[in-house]
Amino acid sequence: MDRLATRFHVLAPDTHGAGKGPVWPEDRALVLEDEVTWLEPVFSRAGTPFSLVGHSYGGAVALIAAVHQPERVRALALYEPTLFSLVDAAYLPPNDADGIRQTVERATTALAAGTRDVAAEHFIDYWMGKGVWQATPLARRGAIEATIVNVHGWGQALFNENTPLQAFCALEMPVLLMEGDNSPPSARAVVSLLTQTLPNVELLEFEELGHMGPVTHPEVVNRAIERFLCCNAAV
């Protein structure tokens, strides 16, 4: 974010359950359009048109925002948007989304049992590799465990999204779609479907990076995002 802030007006809002974001609704399952509605004041503050940058869940939210209001979005830079509903719609289970589906179920069960550390281990090891959680310093675990409580909500929103793949055919703005070649099949399956569908897409694969590439290698990923945004600043 600091790198981009030197050249762009950067706004970094929180979604439900994160930072200053609202709590998850208790009376119903949240859908991604709810996130878009929550972010409307930020979009208004950004002015039109604006570019959206998102990773994982945030990338999925950015895609839905663009579908609902394409005239406001100048460009999209997305690192592995996790819109798993697209995989289920294209290929009936069992499919490439099964790994994360099972991980969400196991993490949710662990949370219900009051074992956040177990939930975190399921989630982190799925995305980053077996043993990564046990190798994580104790000083860093608390912050990670605090975010793990969102796993059930994330899973519901991402697997139950009803926007069809064909809707993304109408997105004419430039899209930078990024993935790591060490990422799990679930994330890469979403990227593959979107690459075949988006009409103005650039696919960028990072060698030896995984799903958490923007966190583990921010300079590499942010350099690509900066290049893309600069090239499309006047689109």
State the predicted function of each range.
Residues 1-28, 48:
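Conserved HGGG/HGGXW glycine-rich cap/lid loop of the alpha/beta-hydrolase fold
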Residues 15-19, 83, 210:
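Alpha/beta-hydrolase active-site loop signature
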Residues 33-50:
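Conserved acidic catalytic loop of the alpha/beta-hydrolase fold
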Residues 48-91:
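Conserved hydrolase catalytic core segment
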Residues 82-112:
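A catalytic-pocket lid/entrance helix-loop region that shapes and gates access to the active site
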Residues 112-152:
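Conserved alpha/beta-hydrolase catalytic His-Asp/Glu region
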Residues 139-196, 202-205:
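Conserved serine/cysteine hydrolase catalytic core
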Residues 200-235:
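Catalytic active-site module of serine/aspartate enzymes centered on a nucleophile-bearing elbow/loop
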